[in-house]
Amino acid sequence: MDKFIAAVVAEEEHKHQIEESYEASGEVDDAGRDDMDDGDDYNSRNLIGEGLKEPIQIRFVDKFDTIEEGIDGGGVTKEFLTSITNEAFSASNGLEALFIENDQHLLYPNPAALEERKATLQQALIKEHSQTWNESTRDLLRRYEFLGRIIGKCLYEGILVDIHFAPFFLLKWALTGGSGSGTKESGYRANLNDLRDLDEGLYQGLLQLKNYSGNVEDFSLNFAVTDTIRTSPTTTNQITRELRPGGSDMPVTNENRLVYISFMARYRLQQQPYHQTNAFLRGLGMIISTSWLSMFNQSELQTLVGGSSTEISVEDLRSNTQYGGLYTIGDDGMEHPSVSLFWKVMQSLDDADRKKVLKFVTSTPRAPLLGFGNLNPRFSIRDSGSDQTRLPSTSTCVNLLKLPVYRDEKVLRERLLYSVNAGAGFNLS
């Protein structure tokens, strides 16, 4: 599968190069580190569409409005994209979380996001379908579209992000533009099994209803569903939707319970999140061809997004590492003693800490799909002085670990893990 994926990506890039025969200067964006998810900053980036296929140059601006030093050799762009995804796909973003997670911490579009936005507007006495109302709801959907483009950009550039999507949501990607679906529309059809990835409690309840041997009218169900919609951190509204016309007056019986289960699955998985999902898929399709997405199943798409879930191979990483400065390997082919200590420490770490080290250096915790030989630029190590109290540092733009000339394995391990767990940002110093 890996070689096939690589071939498809190469073909997509070649196709784009042919289509874009003119010379592009590339998009330049100044990004505030502390305002990655700020409304105005977010909206300005919503204007970026097909242009995201072009190289973009990012300059980080600190809280003093000072542009950070450093040339974007790919690493700054990579940090920019991963920072956006870390913020925007967080399930703890308060009242208007765009994505929420299930019990397995897998993400999918917040089904209630649009209803919550409308309820908030109603509470503010904004007239329905007024210019303010329409612009506010469109703004929400533009955010979903923007995130679709960001994920598409990550896929297009081969940038892995530490995000895990729910399988039913990934299946919608795979079926976008497929047989029986319209342009930019998913051919996905809801089923009871997919509900398990959305709401385990609802899935179990409907399963019990399906297999109930008594009279299901004892549950007093009808063909309607009531949701609690947040209008502020402390207030909520109750909204009832009929699953079919006249559903509020239609009881669920032994005879129609399978129809009820089907309608409930369709409402929760398709109808309620319809606009949010389609906006995301529209943005994704601006960067990645829908025919390309349809080649992969859910598991393969997740691998493309987040990388291989297998353990980090120290041997593979070591054999594909470049060295500089004092650590340059000479004609004798021997590693510097400090480098040998580093690899000894890496071998002793568990997989979780190995991934932390990898993220510290490359900004992503997973290996490329085809192994570290396909990491671009290569993982590299160079010396950074002989002070034993100095901590390792990195330049993520070139996947470079700056490793002091440590002489003791214990010291190296302690200093490395301290740096890794400190959560340092991009820094060229």
Name each model feature, range by range.
Residues 36, 169-429:
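C-terminal catalytic/scaffold cores in eukaryotic proteins
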Residues 1-170, 174-194:
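Hydrophobic, conserved cores of late-appearing folded domains
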